[in-house]
């Protein structure tokens, strides 16, 4: 029976004079010769408990055997600490518990690392012993916030008339984007299920089924290369609505995010959110998820570059590329040539061949390429960039994609390095008017920029066959502080329109029927117009909790190589299991 009075981290002055019962883990033990002090910890925090022979000699005797991470139960009286030993850094810092009775519930071996807020243990060790890592206060607080976010989501959507509906985890493999995780069928020999990359098709079928408003906090799976903000399995807040347009979905989503920020962070955010088209985002920031907490926009200088005799600039423009610049205000004295060389190496990570630069001084432009700027060119540069004396101007000339990627990431790096970002600011932003298609140069074909079920803008339907690169989607992404928080669209709900989309993507009628025939059939039976959005829950928790990567906000995450150090998954299985699944392994040159 849980007979606790309260949690350790909630014992404050309101309990003074009361006899209470606490249970938790021993964080620290200090023996002062006759008195023993223990910091007792649970998920809500720590409280100091005192073993004093004046209160209980028996409890003191037991306390002499207690060590770190023992699980104990204590009975005692809450008293005020002496003023000299008050700890203002913790909620319970003004009180302590004088123990009259203690029970050792379970002992602990010495843990492989110190279980404290700050630890110098490697991440691999902490992931191997994740259940110990989860005891640390920063992670405990993070998962408390995760719960608060999902509670706010459920409360808001329930009040707004949404049904929470579960969709299948074992489903059909379809060519939607990343590689699928496949699950072999024992019963249907040689056939496979796939774990869902998203519930996209099922939530559309729910709209056809008349559910009107659906949501789900759902696990999704993508077998793709990992990075700091990616995991092979992740959780998204999945939403779909019938009889809506883009404005309806965006407004609903703003209301939900406003509720989350108020309930979880105590912050009132302004709605509606600012909006920016995809074209504006790429023009001014070089990226489709701009961090608008600081300025330093990219400036396109193709007109100026075409007038100059600098071959690097002129050649980039003539070959259909671009010349863009960013202005680092007041940085001409802060960055030496060596510092700028380091920035150049960073830009090269994103494909740039080099990083040109000039400094604006009393005597005009100064730097390796200053000689290529005639007086009129220099004047035009300063007008275009609004650069002033003391500023540093950085240029990249290359293909549009390289220029944008290198300067966008360089801008973000400089924003952090120079302290231009207010870390307490939450800048939400909509990016709209997305291209419907993306072109893959290597494969020489178009792909859906979001997914094949996104509706094109009505006025662009006729261009599906003739000008794919100009077709815009009824799609919208919500961005927070330079991260894509979620994305959505108005869906195709007409069979003929969906056929046109598949055709534009290079599907034959047979391929479309094979992969998506069940959806096409559903469109025959009165599909309502519908749209929705999906937001990354893990990423939202990461951003609101100030954590640096997704592994910190998932209870049992995978490593960068998609392994679980705790359970050693993935692992080999018995030959008998493979035989039952009709699978033979063909692994060459594999070492594991």
Swiss-Prot record:
Q: Which GO terms describe its molecular function?
A: aspartate-tRNA ligase activity; ATP binding; catalytic activity, acting on a protein; nucleic acid binding; transferase activity
The family database entries (Pfam families) matched by this protein are listed as:
GAD, tRNA-synt_2, tRNA_anti-codon
Origin superkingdom = Bacteria
Give compartment(s): Cytoplasm
Xref: SUPFAM superfamilies = Class II aaRS and biotin synthetases, GAD domain-like, Nucleic acid-binding proteins
* Gene3D superfamilies assigned to the protein according to its UniProt record, in alphabetical order: Bira Bifunctional Protein, Domain 2 (3.30.930.10), GAD-like domain (3.30.1360.30), Nucleic acid-binding proteins (2.40.50.140)
Q: Which reaction does it catalyse?
A: tRNA(Asp) + L-aspartate + ATP = L-aspartyl-tRNA(Asp) + AMP + diphosphate
Record GO cellular component, one term: cytoplasm
Query: What are the EC numbers?
Result: 6.1.1.12
InterPro entries found in the cross-reference section: Aa-tRNA-synt_II, aa-tRNA-synth_II, aa-tRNA-synth_II/BPL/LPL, Asp-tRNA-ligase_1, Asp-tRNA-ligase_1_N, Asp/Asn-tRNA-synth_IIb, AspRS_core, GAD-like_sf
Which UniProt keyword terms apply here?
A: Aminoacyl-tRNA synthetase, ATP-binding, Cytoplasm, Ligase, Nucleotide-binding, Protein biosynthesis
Where do the annotations place L-aspartate binding? 176, 222, 450, 491
Q: What is the enzyme's main class?
A: ligase
Q: Where is this region: Aspartate?
A: 200-203
Name the residues that bind ATP. Answer: 222-224, 231, 484, 536-539
- Name its GO BP terms in alphabetical order: aspartyl-tRNA aminoacylation
Q: Could you give the subunit structure recorded for this chain?
A: Homodimer.
Which PANTHER family does this entry report, sorted A to Z?
A: ASPARTATE--TRNA LIGASE, MITOCHONDRIAL, ASPARTYL/LYSYL-TRNA SYNTHETASE
Function of this protein?
Catalyzes the attachment of L-aspartate to tRNA(Asp) in a two-step reaction: L-aspartate is first activated by ATP to form Asp-AMP and then transferred to the acceptor end of tRNA(Asp).
Protein family per UniProt = Belongs to the class-II aminoacyl-tRNA synthetase family. Type 1 subfamily.
Q: What is the recorded name of this protein? A: Aspartate--tRNA ligase
